[in-house]
């Protein structure tokens, strides 16, 4: 009987940890999505930011990678924001004017 109780207790604890682990990961995903939406709202509604098409942003990103040692491109890359929505894979690229 002691073995049965131990096994039952162990399985209950494992099930609880499994449910807790799943719940924590979904909360993390929700928090990340909230952060992304807040970031998009901050930059999309700001008239000082210009949003680029995906192709324009790819070209800009490749220029930044090629000129890593250039201080001008470094300051440019710090002003560019790449926001990704992991659910529907849409992208927004915004750059400060």
UniProtKB/Swiss-Prot annotation:
Alphabetical list of PROSITE patterns matching this protein: PROKAR_LIPOPROTEIN
Residues lipid-modified (N-palmitoyl cysteine): 22
Keyword Cell membrane found: yes
Keywords carried by this UniProt record: Cell membrane, Lipoprotein, Membrane, Palmitate, Plasmid, Signal
Membrane topology label: Lipid-anchor
InterPro entries recorded: DUF5425
GO cellular component terms given for this protein: plasma membrane
Subcellular location: Cell membrane
Main localization, broad class: membrane
Signal sequence extent: 1-21
Keyword Disulfide bond set for record: no
Covalent lipidation (S-diacylglycerol cysteine), chain numbering: 22
Family label: To B.burgdorferi BBD15.
Protein name: Uncharacterized lipoprotein BBF20
Species classification: Bacteria, Pseudomonadati, Spirochaetota, Spirochaetia, Spirochaetales
């Amino acid at each position: 009987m002691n073995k049965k109780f131990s096994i039952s207790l162990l399985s209950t604890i494992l099930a609880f940890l499994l449910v807790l682990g799943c719940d924590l990961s979904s909360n993390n995903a929700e928090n990340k999505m909230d952060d992304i939406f807040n970031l998009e709202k901050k930059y999309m509604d700001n008239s000082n930011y210009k949003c680029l098409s995906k192709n324009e942003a790819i070209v800009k990103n490749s220029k930044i990678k090629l000129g890593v040692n250039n201080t001008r491109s470094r300051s440019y890359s710090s002003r560019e924001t790449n926001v990704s929505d992991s659910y529907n894979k849409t992208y927004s690229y915004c750059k400060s004017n």
